[in-house]
């Protein structure tokens, strides 16, 4: 049986390759971690060649596990860590520097300089993003300013810039394709999301030559054919999306007003706003959710820095649990009469506060506070931060209502207790899918639908399966009191008034 779909999920700490059959069942999986480099405080880098090797390795593992050959694969879909920046030689394919990862903060001072020049409104108007080191544009500017001779080579078209998807497509096609998709382009700080083009004015401000930029395609498109020297056959690459946008697709959030939230180390929530390119007044990001058949669908995005990382903190630094899976059972034992708040601003606060200098704190401690109360506070902090995002989205866009259903994925959502508390605090239903690997599923659907093997959007949405719906059950007075306590706690951690 042919018609298998290969989905590559290139993440921040590991690479996974997953094979799906025609019935959307997983038949093979390869996973491999790779090295994290920290050359200086606040700097994070990856070896792009090591990432490429991990992709090749995991593909071979997945094929072997499935017991099929590459000739049985009908199409490839790719999803990737967003914003991470690679520059490589157009002829040799060799990177000129290690990839600068999305977490890297080396361009913070440069971003501050641009803000002092009052340029943030211009960048936000065109890209939907904020002037922050998080995004690719200032990382690329740093490389052009610090790698000897790179600017001249870029002006001559001798080097290529790309996010990880672009780098992998270049390598998979044997250097024949220098392309990206609209979702990854929308995270670079140099792409006009309203006009769907690289923006000359922003390129000029950052000093980036247009000759080094990839062609931007729809998320489901012909991105090129794999080099037959790699796997013995040429396989079409037909789908690409950044990881959070791929999760929107994998959760079948195709209608305006649908929202997904991914809970891993941090949390990323995206709200589908349809063709409305909403400008946030609450410092949320406006981004491209996906572009299909030439039609751009937008989203509001909010990011939380600390979600599952709060549980890791309880385990690794506090020693309250030995494994992360213990935390829910421990939280259930907490004294309901104690109201403890953990504001997990270990690395500042993300949306909608964007306070990099804020630091974590715990409020409400009594002599009776113990491990169980800490566990509950850590899990509740995720719910409260998600509430902050949803409230900001409702303030920005009329389509976000109290009837919004949140579809969730990521490691934390396996906990029934956490999901119920999330529904209670949001006062909104929370849907957990049967298949939790929605990011890689989204990449697979893009490729499979383009190949005509899997159903279209409507058919895929109908096949999306819910494992459980968590309905809000907390009395309104209790909920309002809990949220008031959270707001008071956050206000004490902020370094500037909101």
UniProtKB/Swiss-Prot annotation:
Alphabetized HAMAP family for the sequence: Glycerol_kin
Protein name: Glycerol kinase
Keywords per UniProt: ATP-binding, Glycerol metabolism, Kinase, Nucleotide-binding, Transferase
PROSITE patterns documented for this protein: FGGY_KINASES_1, FGGY_KINASES_2
SUPFAM superfamilies per UniProt: Actin-like ATPase domain (SSF53067)
Binding residues annotated for ADP, in chain numbering: 12, 16, 265, 308, 411
Pathway in which the depicted protein is active: Polyol metabolism; glycerol degradation via glycerol kinase pathway; sn-glycerol 3-phosphate from glycerol: step 1/1
Record bears the keyword Transit peptide: no
Enzyme type, top EC level: transferase
GO cellular component, one term: cytosol
GO molecular function: ATP binding; glycerol kinase activity
Activity regulation (UniProt): Inhibited by fructose 1,6-bisphosphate (FBP).
Chain residues that bind sn-glycerol 3-phosphate: 12, 82-83, 134, 243
Pfam families documented for this protein: FGGY_C (PF02782), FGGY_N (PF00370)
GO BP terms: glycerol catabolic process; glycerol metabolic process; glycerol-3-phosphate metabolic process
Organism field: Brucella canis (strain ATCC 23365 / NCTC 10854 / RM-666)
Catalytic activity: glycerol + ATP = sn-glycerol 3-phosphate + ADP + H(+)
Enzyme Commission number(s): 2.7.1.30
Residues that, per the record, bind glycerol: 82-83, 134, 243-244
Entry binding sites for ATP: 12-14, 265, 308, 312, 411
Family membership noted in the UniProt record: Belongs to the FGGY kinase family.
Function: Key enzyme in the regulation of glycerol uptake and metabolism. Catalyzes the phosphorylation of glycerol to yield sn-glycerol 3-phosphate.
